[in-house]
Structure formats: structure tokens, C-alpha cells
Regions:
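Short, glycine/charged-rich beta-strand-loop motifs at protein surfaces that mediate ligand recognition
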Residues: 20, 33-39, 52
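Acidic, glycine/proline-rich low-complexity segments that act as flexible tails and inter-domain linkers
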Residues: 1-24, 54, 76-93
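Short, structured motif recognition centered on aromatic/hydrophobic residues
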Residues: 26-36, 45, 62-69
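Short amphipathic alpha-helical segments at helix boundaries and their inter-helical linkers
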Residues: 41-48, 69-84
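Short basic/hydrophobic patches in alpha-helices and adjacent helix-turn junctions
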Residues: 36, 50-55, 64, 68-71, ...
Length: 93
């Protein structure tokens, strides 16, 4: 298992995330949308929601990005992603 985790980290966060054309905010948002489209990846989705916040994307931007995915990934996956968004970034009271 450790060997797979090491490979995943070096490939995704080394080779892929260090490319120069996209900025980190756009790259993290695209990653979030891709994971949302897969379904069944809620732990990874939550991690990338927090990752988006860490690089400066707001809840509003993420809400808009996931809404944009709706016609392409369907209601169930979009609603699951929005549920994860609400869990990681609950509405302020």
C-alpha cells in the first residue's frame, strides 16, 4: 500500500501539479471537478475542497464550478459533491 501511495503522490503532486501553464487555483478546481465526476470518492473530494481553500478558491467559486458540472456529471454526483462542500465549508451563522 505504501508503494502505491508514494507513486500516487509523486505522479499527481510532482509531475502533474508542477506543470507551469495553469495556476494552482485553476489546477485545484479542475481536480475537484474531475473527482466529483467520478462519484464514490468523497474522502478525496473533501480533501480537494480543503485544498482549493488553501490555494485561495472561495466556497462561492467552488459552488459555481460544481454547478457548471451539473449537465455533464448529473444530479446525483453534483449533489454528493455539494454535500461534501457543505460538510467541509458549512454556512456561517
Amino acid at each position: 500500500l505504501q508503494q502505491i501511495q508514494d507513486y500516487l503522490s509523486s505522479f499527481c503532486f510532482g509531475d502533474t501539479y508542477t506543470r507551469k501553464t495553469l495556476n494552482l487555483q485553476d489546477r485545484e478546481m479542475l481536480t475537484l471537478c474531475a473527482i466529483a465526476s467520478l462519484g464514490g470518492c468523497e474522502p478525496q473530494l473533501k480533501a480537494h475542497i480543503q485544498g482549493n481553500v488553501n490555494v485561495g478558491n472561495t466556497k462561492g467559486i467552488l459552488l459555481e464550478a460544481l454547478t457548471q458540472c451539473l449537465p455533464y456529471i448529473g444530479f446525483p454526483r453534483t449533489l454528493n459533491a455539494l454535500g461534501c462542500l457543505s460538510q467541509v465549508l458549512p454556512d456561517k451563522k
